[in-house]
Amino acid sequence: MFDSIVIPFGAKALYNTIKLKPGVTIDDVELAMGEMCNVVKNNYGGDKGGFIAGQVLKFSGFVSDEGSLGPSRGADHDLAIVTYWRSFAEHERSHADAQFHAKFSVLAEMCADSKELGYEILWQGNAE
């Protein structure tokens, strides 16, 4: 669950930002997110459906002055889920599944907004 991940070049990255409803905390959504992520990992991992790896991120409030251009120093979301897939089509098939929908709907009840945007990896590397 907390192991390093390896992302092959050419994988599709889906970046899902989540804004929680007022009064909802990270602790409130932790179980729902864990169950949803387990459905994806267990049912669609590797040859079963193209899921490669994923990460759940919490915005922690620190902002890089060196890497930021505009005046905004905040985020419009609380959490991000980054998943990596062999293809966008495999991602969409997994998320159309009834079992995934059941788990996602529990999380959605606690969210004010969620956007899932797709990216292609242009560069990646490790420290030498």
Predicted regions and their residues:
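Short S/T/G/P-rich N-terminal loop/turn motif that feeds into the first structured element of a domain
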Residues: 1-101, 112-128
